[in-house]
Amino acid sequence: MEPQEEFITTEEVEQEIVPTVEVEQDVPVDIEGENDDDDEMMNDDEEALEVDMSNNSLTYFDKHTDSVFAIGHHPNLPLVCTGGGDNLAHLWTSHSQPPKFAGTLTGYGESVISCSFTSEGGFLVTADMSGKVLVHMGQKGGAQWKLASQMQEVEEIVWLKTHPTIARTFAFGATDGSVWCYQINEQDGSLEQLMSGFVHQQDCSMGEFINTDKGENTLELVTCSLDSTIVAWNCFTGQQLFKITQAEIKGLEAPWISLSLAPETLTKGNSGVVACGSNNGLLAVINCNNGGAILHLSTVIELKPEQDELDASIESISWSSKFSLMAIGLVCGEILLYDTSAWRVRHKFVLEDSVTKLMFDNDDLFASCINGKVYQFNARTGQEKFVCVGHNMGVLDFILLHPVANTGTEQKRKVITAGDEGVSLVFEVPN
């Protein structure tokens, strides 16, 4: 049965929330800090960045000299990796205040757009916009990271992800539409190519591993492209599991740019349901374990005449593992919160500028924005709970850290950002 085309109108939205601009407790922060001998955060001759606005961050890392595009965190150690427009990746600690600088990774030919540790924590995989992939091996318990291997198979990499459960495994997509999957040798860090796929005719814009709960004998990936195709792959054989084209989506043009895997708690144990969003506002929900059956297809926004076409672009998608909720974030600043049991919009949040990333965590929805803020909402009520402020340019990425168990001290969650002005800020989430 064909899915019904649905247009979300303002009448269908139960509640619209416009976040407040001010934060209750604005704490000014001295960004210059003190030059501590063992801090290694800033050289005396470096010019400090002046942030002329309120700032409620705990601390900061500012060694990048250009935009910070990517941020990743080690699965076990308090270690952050950030990648920037300065063609560098930096390692630094997430538990100390201020952060302790732990090393710089060099050898990139362009901006570093992905920093990802492997699931077991033994390797760090980074990628840049010149098509380079560098693999660093952790030594001395993760205190040192040594270059183990590198490759350059494509002109430009768009995305790279490590597998969440299979050790030493990663995949990436390129601007020529190609898809690649590799496994890292545990002993020496050398690379074994598992597959390469050449089905997409335009940029392979995003990828997501699926069926990650099935053990190490199942290695499957779904990718999407600006050419309106969505493809699922068996990464061990390189075979296509299915391919969705414009014909399967009513002939609509859908330059896909975002992908998100639904948690099994929402899908009765099916770990192959994904949502895919396009840069013209089309949303598709697909069952990858049923030949790519389309469960839902809709246009999420009706643009006003004065709006730009890209205002409808779905930049980020996130599913709640606790409630029947899914959120999508648009370039126009709207966040639509869907009730996944009925595919109706339960809430609409309106931010001041483009949404860059969404993340559910327990009862909360976190959203980063080009206005330089990260918002914390109560996912069920839509109530704004906290706003991270301190950037004077956009937040391009962020991670959320949970307190380490059994430390004996009461700790709070932390938001760590990747800022367009070259700074990462560390925030403590008060509740």
Curated annotation (Swiss-Prot):
Q: Which InterPro entries match?
A: WD40/YVTN_repeat-like_dom_sf (IPR015943), WD40_repeat_dom_sf (IPR036322), WD40_rpt (IPR001680), WD_repeat_multifunction (IPR051179)
Which Pfam families does its entry note?
A: WD40
Which UniProt key words apply to this protein? Repeat, WD repeat
Q: What Gene Ontology terms describe what this protein does at the molecular function level?
A: unfolded protein binding
Q: Name one GO cellular component term.
A: cytoplasm
Which residue intervals correspond to the WD repeats?
63-102, 107-146, 149-192, 199-243, 309-348, 350-387
Gene Ontology BP annotations: ribosomal large subunit assembly; ribosomal large subunit biogenesis
> Is Transcription there in the keyword field?
no
Other notes: Present with 19700 molecules/cell in log phase SD medium.
Protein role: May be involved in the late step of 60S ribosomal subunit assembly or modification in the cytoplasm.
Subunit structure, interactors included: Interacts strongly with QSR1. Part of an oligomeric protein complex that is loosely associated with ribosomes.
Under the heading PANTHER family, the entry gives: ANGIO-ASSOCIATED MIGRATORY CELL PROTEIN, MITOCHONDRIAL DIVISION PROTEIN 1-RELATED
Q: What is this protein called?
A: Ribosome assembly protein SQT1
Q: Which organism is it from?
A: Saccharomyces cerevisiae (strain ATCC 204508 / S288c) (Baker's yeast)
Lineage runs: Eukaryota, Fungi, Dikarya, Ascomycota, Saccharomycotina
